[in-house]
């Protein structure tokens, strides 16, 4: 049976892709056929191969099962803004059925599929659909990425509560050091351990620029996911 997870974050730019790549690496090391899925991505660049998003490309590189870019990222937008805004501007609606079909295709090939969201938990995909709505429909277990900085405790508690209210399992969380650790870093982590009702899968240290290029799977312990 395919293991399926959804990665969300406490905010945008908290390192969801860094954590997702680490998860894919760690699962591959456990012997799984892995694939990462970025169904919706904004902030992309035109290349000789067409519009490409750096986060989706990172997931593609870190998947053990080769996939064409279109399978990894069915909705790609150039402007780095909320998906519901840019999709409306371009007249290209985001269809939940397309997201689900893409997920089914990957699940048929891999035994460990990780879907990475965009922005935070309630990121709108249209005037009537949020990413949270789709995840709830798919009944995906959730992994929360916390960008460790001032304010992250409140954001983590709010997101964990929202996941719980959606009736979805929060199966783990990852602390991602998105800046050099400050004086209160240890206290932030200690508090997060107390207030997030899920096991800590690991802490990814501050790696400077281009952290998605690093071998980050070593920082994670997936045994709580194996037991779930």
Predicted features and spans:
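Conserved glycine(s) of the Walker
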Residues: 14-15
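Inter-motif core of Ras-like GTPase G domains
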Residues: 126-149
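Short internal beta-strands
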Residues: 38, 143-146, 171-177
